[in-house]
Amino acid sequence: MRLPGCAAVGRGQTTASGYLGGMPLRLLVGSRPKLIATGLGLRPVAEHRVMPVGGRDLDPPEVAYLAGTRIGRTEVTGLDAAAVPAGPLYVHLDLDVIDSADVPGLRYPAPGGPGCADVAEALRMLLATGRVAAVGIACTWHPGHSAAARTGPYLEGTLATGS
């Protein structure tokens, strides 16, 4: 499960930003294995096991790529336990999934997203499945940001209780 502001399926040749953080899902499902996976001995994850949640800042090539895959997509507020892939889950939360008005100071803001409370509720639902093996949180803030004071309580409360 990945909760990003962007789809994270860009390619170095087609991404508008050129930012490597916008490419991990595509690499995860087997694109360009020599770049990272082969050297580390990693195998691709099956497309049907990958689900970006809330990704909305997509380049046209990303839209076209996703249309031709088995990668599932949903919105944060539309996420339900029945749609979650079976088996153990790695949940990656990129704070740019949260509306940029709620998380000022992001280097790669994605306006129009869900609020902190909606994202915290989605995390609680995922944790309640009992199948979350690990959670990663990523955020690229400009120095001197003030968003931690807003988002911190939602994340701390959600992750501390595990539900």
Residue ranges and their predicted role:
Residues S31, A37-V50, G55-P60:
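Phosphate/diphosphate-binding glycine-rich loops and adjacent basic-rich segments that engage nucleotide
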Residues V63-S163:
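Catalytic cores of soluble, metal-dependent hydrolases
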